[in-house]
Amino acid sequence: LYELANISNSDIKLLINSFNTLADDFDIIIIDTSAGISKNVTSFITSSNETIVITTPEPGALADAYAIIKISREFCDKIHVVVNKADNYKEANRTMEKLSRSAKKFLNMQLNYLGFVLEDETVHKANMEQVAFFVNYPNSLASKCLMDIGRKLVYGEPLLPKTNVTLNNWFTRLESILKAN
């Protein structure tokens, strides 16, 4: 991700062409930009029409999430939130409440809560095995949480709004933003 966060202008065209190829086969592309804000991570955010912010209950993670939300609100139609590594349902909800209160008070905006993923040893175990926890441990707590989030995305409101925004439009916006930086 370091390389992606600091991509050169010469590699931007290659990246955009790769994304354009994907756009022929997929309606949605999710890009994991990791924590923190670099110039090119910000470019991905500003070219998106929706953002899914994934945070943990730790104060530093909440500060990073708030910063992403603050940038995203100017460019995204919707900002979704997932609380990751929560010890329990109450901790996840408290975390979301803190973030929601701050967004409402200081940014005058509502966040869409997609759900939470509980802290689960099978995630660490799967990482050590270099496999997806969802595949090898489909009945784990984390997998069940992920299924709930997936159901909300699939059966709830569509992730991409019903507008004329297409992936090809997005790639064009991304390319112009990255070149400008």
Predicted feature residues:
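NTP-binding/hydrolysis catalytic cores, primarily Walker-type P-loop NTPases
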Residues: 132-181
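Conserved C-terminal guanine-recognition region of P-loop GTPase G domains, centered on the G4
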Residues: 16-19, 62-78
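G-domain G4 guanine-recognition motif of GTPases
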Residues: 56-57, 79-94, 116-123, 136-138
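Inter-motif core of Ras-like GTPase G domains
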Residues: 16-25, 38-60
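Beta-strand-loop-alpha "switch" segments that mediate conformational coupling across diverse proteins
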Residues: 107-134, 145-148
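P-loop/Walker-type NTP enzyme "switch/lid" segment
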Residues: 1-24, 127-129
